[in-house]
């Protein structure tokens, strides 16, 4: 089934989750996933011309719930609260913010915990996917909604990788892009830390080769450990030392089996993830990050970026040790539609793109200004 074969569907009510059927998807690898469903939420009204959509793309463990309180279908508050709404950077009196849950995820979209055609969870049968596959699924979902061109795509981290694949792979479908805290390809450092996280999950006996969903046991210990390691790469070194130094946790004594304060903090982060995320999705999405390379099949990174005609804003975080500024500088130097790297000062590391909402909000406004100008040129 091609994108044009999918019957037109409708956006959900504002803030509610809608499930969009996109049919079968052939992946970059050649594998096929049948009966793909993509979860979406939206804020703001779709214009009569369907040309005011801003697609918001989440990071590894995010979902479609970018703003608002917890509720049915979304157990945590919005992960980018304040970014979309009346008078917000994505001003919903003018723009229609649409957020998807990524292919391979576990908050409504098809992933390892979803049921396959035989009525059993996909589990280990779920194929490896790429960032391009994720974007193909999003493009198909929007097409099913009758949206064939969007004003802008906005994302950080894995969402930034998706935004990059949008502007490079679908330049006729997007007028501007915001690429935050991301690079053109996965680095050795990223792959090293991420494959170690995957190894922690798979070393848990309850992983059961990925087919644990109907056994009553899940690789919770492995997922906790993976999240603890990942969270260290998300935060800034100075921030962590300022908050925790080498302090004990309360009255505990590490020399007598107690914990350090930072140790307790990381354990808490691991516990929080268990309540809302599937280990199989964590593995699948992390593998997608490992294989991220915008230059694959396009003549290399430089050729792929130089050929992109879409106006973009590229932003990086000063203290980001997972995606250091040199990676965003490369994007800014090679993308013809970029007017220079925008640097966000922050002590919060990679997570600065989530925390520094005022600075990031200004980058979003700049991106939408580019979308306006590009729209005028295309008319």
Curated annotation (Swiss-Prot):
Which EC number applies? 2.3.1.31
> Where do the AB hydrolase-1 domain residues begin and end?
52-356
Alphabetically list the UniProt keywords: Acyltransferase, Amino-acid biosynthesis, Cytoplasm, Methionine biosynthesis, Transferase
Coarse class of the primary localization is cytoplasm
Q: Where in the cell is it found?
A: Cytoplasm
Record-listed substrate binding positions:
227, 351
First-level EC class? transferase
Role, per record:
Transfers an acetyl group from acetyl-CoA to L-homoserine, forming acetyl-L-homoserine.
The record's subunit annotation is:
Homodimer.
Q: Which NCBIfam families match?
A: homoserO_Ac_trn, PRK00175.1
What this protein is called in its record is Homoserine O-acetyltransferase
In which organism is this protein found?
Mycobacterium tuberculosis (strain CDC 1551 / Oshkosh)
| Lineage of producing organism | Bacteria, Bacillati, Actinomycetota, Actinomycetes, Mycobacteriales
Gene for this chain = metXA
């Amino acid at each position: 089934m091609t994108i044009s074969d999918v019957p037109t569907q409708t956006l959900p009510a504002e803030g509610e989750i809608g499930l969009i059927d996109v049919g079968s998807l052939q992946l970059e690898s050649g594998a096929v996933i049948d009966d793909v469903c993509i979860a979406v939420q939206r804020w703001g009204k779709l214009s009569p011309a369907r040309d005011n959509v801003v697609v918001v793309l989440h990071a590894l463990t995010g979902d479609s719930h970018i703003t608002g309180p917890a509720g049915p279908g979304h157990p945590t508050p919005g992960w980018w609260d304040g970014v979309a709404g009346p008078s917000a950077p994505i001003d919903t009196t003018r723009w229609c913010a649409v957020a998807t849950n990524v292919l391979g995820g576990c908050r409504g979209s098809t992933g390892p915990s979803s049921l396959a055609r035989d009525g059993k969870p996909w589990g280990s049968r779920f194929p490896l996917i790429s960032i391009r596959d994720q974007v193909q699924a999003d493009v198909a979902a929007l097409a099913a909604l009758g949206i064939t061109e969007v004003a802008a795509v906005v994302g950080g981290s894995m969402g930034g990788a998706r935004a990059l694949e949008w502007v490079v792979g679908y330049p006729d479908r997007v007028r501007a892009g915001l690429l935050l805290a991301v690079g053109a390809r996965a680095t050795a450092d990223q792959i090293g830390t991420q494959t170690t996280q995957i190894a922690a999950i798979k070393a848990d006996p309850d992983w059961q080769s990925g087919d644990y969903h109907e056994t009553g046991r899940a690789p919770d210990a492995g997922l906790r450990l993976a999240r603890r390691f990942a969270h260290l790469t998300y935060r800034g070194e100075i921030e962590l030392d300022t908050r925790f130094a080498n302090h004990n946790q309360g009255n505990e004594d590490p020399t007598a089996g107690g914990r350090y304060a930072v140790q307790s903090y990381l354990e808490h982060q691991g516990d929080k993830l268990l309540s809302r995320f599937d280990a199989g999705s964590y593995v699948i999405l992390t593998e997608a990050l490992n294989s991220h390379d915008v230059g694959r099949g396009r003549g290399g990174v430089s050729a792929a970026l130089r050929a992109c005609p879409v106006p973009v804003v590229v932003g990086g975080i000063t203290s980001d040790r997972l995606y250091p500024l040199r990676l965003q500088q490369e994007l800014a130097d090679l993308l013809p539609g970029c007017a220079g790297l925008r640097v966000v000062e922050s002590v919060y590391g990679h997570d600065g793109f989530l925390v520094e909402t005022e600075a990031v909000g200004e980058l979003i406004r700049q991106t939408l200004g580019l979308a306006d100008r590009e729209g005028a040129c295309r008319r």
